[in-house]
Regions:
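Secretory targeting and sorting signals
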Residues: 1-21
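Solvent-exposed loop/turn segments at secondary-structure junctions
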Residues: 45-46, 74, 81-85, 96-99, ...
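His/Asp/Glu-rich mid-to-C-terminal helical/loop segments that flank catalytic regions of hydrolases
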Residues: 255-306
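Flexible, small-residue-rich helix->loop connector segments that border functional cores
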Residues: 96, 131-145, 169, 301-302, ...
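Alpha-helical metal-binding/catalytic segments enriched in His/Glu/Asp
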Residues: 105, 109-158, 296
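N-terminal capping segment at the start of a domain
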Residues: 22-55, 110, 184-187, 270-277
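Metal-dependent peptidase/peptidase-like ectodomains
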Residues: 151-254
């Protein structure tokens, strides 16, 4: 923990060991599941998906926004156009903390057209929503400013998050001190991956260490993964913003060593329903969803100085 605190201090992401160990709440996984059930209902009512340009995506945005508005967040919907259709980013600011030091977390809210996308990425989106609502319920007054983003059209090439970052001025980018991404956290044959800081902007190592510490606090071993430009952190990294994230695995098969470490089935994909119609609410490993969501809270509460 001393090393973690030192890394955070050096990179400007200051946090005390006591805060990192004590501040973060245990997020009730049943609440996260309730959000996933609503996203499933939305998909069922809108042609079986929540994809860009389809009514299911806008309905998903409206659901998340209504929850955040009722909790006291300052929200706005940012629109963009891709493939001839309107896309939507949802930005939510907790109206406290130093606005010159912004800690941001996000994940994409759209699915592919083939299915409802409950793991990819209902899981990360729902976890972020419940952490945001927990901040509000606890009436947290952080030292730093907390902002969330739910991105559109990720499945078409990270379109929404790239549009958001490109819309920021240099000054607006400079105040974002960290961006943490959560894309797939409930894979049915789960892994516990932390984004590698290798090749990422200065300050990313502190986020990597913090996320690893969050899992270690729950007794969960991790592996680093190089996600490259595969998810919404990429636009932030290109802007020089420190990034990190967690991931429970997609189409790649779990190795025997990973199955021994984490349980589950060797030589089977982490998520056999990745980008398929079967990515439904029945495609979620609740233990993985619970652990990853708690680590979202651990990281954010630590970074904002809750």
């Amino acid at each position: 923990m001393k090393l973690l605190a030192a890394l955070l201090l050096v990179t400007g992401l200051t946090i005390s060991p006591a805060q990192a160990a004590l501040a973060a709440p245990d997020i009730p996984v049943a609440n996260v599941q309730a959000h996933l059930n609503e996203l499933q209902r939305i998909a069922n009512a809108n042609g079986g998906n929540r994809a860009h340009g389809r009514p299911g995506h806008k309905a998903s945005v409206d659901y998340v926004k209504a929850k955040l508005d009722a909790a006291g967040y300052q929200t706005r919907i940012q629109t963009f156009t891709n493939s001839g259709a309107t896309g939507y980013n949802l930005i939510a600011d907790w109206p406290f903390g130093d606005a010159s030091q912004v800690i941001m977390a996000g994940g994409h809210l759209d699915s592919v057209t083939r299915g409802p996308g409950i793991n990819d990425n209902g899981s990360g989106s729902a976890g972020l929503l419940e952490v945001a609502l927990t901040v509000a319920r606890q009436n947290v007054r952080p030292a730093k400013h907390l902002r969330f983003g739910w991105w559109g059209a990720e499945e078409l090439g990270l379109v929404g998050s790239t549009f958001y970052v490109n819309s920021l001025t240099s000054a607006q980018k400079s105040v974002i001190k960290a961006y943490v991404n959560f894309d797939m956290t409930g894979s049915p044959n789960p892994g516990y991956f932390v984004y590698s800081s290798s090749g990422q902007p200065s300050g990313s190592l502190a986020i990597e260490d913090l996320l690893e510490a969050g899992f270690a606090a729950k007794g969960v071993p991790t592996e680093l993964t190089s996600v490259g430009g595969r998810s919404d952190h990429a636009a932030f990294a290109r802007a020089g913003i420190p990034t990190g994230g967690t991931f429970s695995g997609a189409e790649v098969r779990k190795t025997a060593a990973q199955a021994q470490k984490w349980g589950g089935q060797a030589n089977v994909a982490f998520d056999r329903c990745y980008h398929q119609a079967c990515d439904t609410s029945g495609n979620i490993n609740v233990t993985s969803l619970d652990r990853h969501t708690d680590v979202i809270a651990y990281a954010l509460y630590s970074l904002i100085g809750a």
